[in-house]
Amino acid sequence: MKATLEKIAELQKAGIIERFAIGGGIAHFYYIEAGTTYDLDVMVTMNAQASTIFSLEPLYEWAKKSGYIVSEEHIIIEGIPVQFLPSFNATITEAIEQADLVEIFGVKTFIMKPEYLMVIMLDTYRAKDRERLIKFFTQSGYSTTLFEALVAKFNLVEKLKEFKAKYYGH
């Protein structure tokens, strides 16, 4: 994992990606009890060009030049399947911009704050997201104030009410 994180940092230094933050299962396990995950999800903003069409092509070109295998949506970097996900909405963009600088395996990297992960899980609402969201409410040291502000900002108040009614009876 250390070598993988170092390569991702190099992508930013080289200007291939503008900003990034670890999200998905690996980010979740930074804050809550570990479970299983297959890959490393890296949310990215790319350096803007004249086109408004978002493309991960520079990442795939880098992978090819660097001798890394591309397998479906993953680039296998130093043995770790990495899925680069574009910043496709305001929530993800803000989560990347507000990410915390942390040290993992001796490498400085960016990871999404727990409140943003929680809002993203509430928004996507897959079964594994709901399960992890319950763990976040009970295991992570998140800011209730920030979480509630983000829920309101990203129009998820009703969804949170439904979630709480279903899983907590209120």
Language-model-derived ranges and their functions:
Residues M1-H170:
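Compositionally biased terminal segments of proteins
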